[in-house]
Amino acid sequence: KRHRVMKKHNKIIIAVPRGRILSELRIFFKKIKLNPDKSLFDESCRKLRFKSSDPSIDFIKVRAFDVCTFVAFGAAHIGIAGSDVIEEFDYSEIYSPIKLNIGKCHLSVAALKSLLVKEKPKSWSNIRVATKYPNLTKKHFAKRGIQVETIKLNGSMELAPALKMCRRIVDLVSTGKTLKENGLIEVEKIFNVTSKLIVNRSALKTNLEINKIIKKFLN
């Protein structure tokens, strides 16, 4: 009976994030000859699980912030996640062996332009910050001896200062255009962000096929 259960779940599941990174991943998968069903890249497609050119591998498409959770809890064996999400959740069950050098941007502190006219960031002591990354935000400011209250938002971060919820945000920055258009200035880069291959540690130890997939990504 146990053997049958294992057979039922013998497919390797790779979790990928929704959004703009999918176009970069499409090129990447083509290079390593691991091709998901084309519908994976169709934004209008409501399917969540997809077959691939390898019958032993299926893909699932989830929110970028959920990839790590699916992998950490074993629902997916492998995933593609941003280093921002990996660091925010810091799951012990996740191993991230390879930088993919796609989805590049950086995590930064930004503040209202009007605030920076009145005070310098060095003078900050007790602040409120809107962010999708409460753990990383607290860690960052704790290193500087700054007390921080975080407001957890999942998007439209730039609206929080405009509507007086706070005067500072921590968010991903690519070109800086969105910050500028909303009266914000980038104050400090926290770290550079890139996508990484992540693996469930238990699956890595028990499934030899996962090592073969990792080697494909290394090539």
Roles of regions detected by a PLM:
Residues 6-219:
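Domain-level signature for soluble enzymes in the chorismate/prephenate branch of the shikimate pathway
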Residues 1-5:
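Short, Lys/Arg-enriched N-terminal segments with co-localized hydrophobic residues
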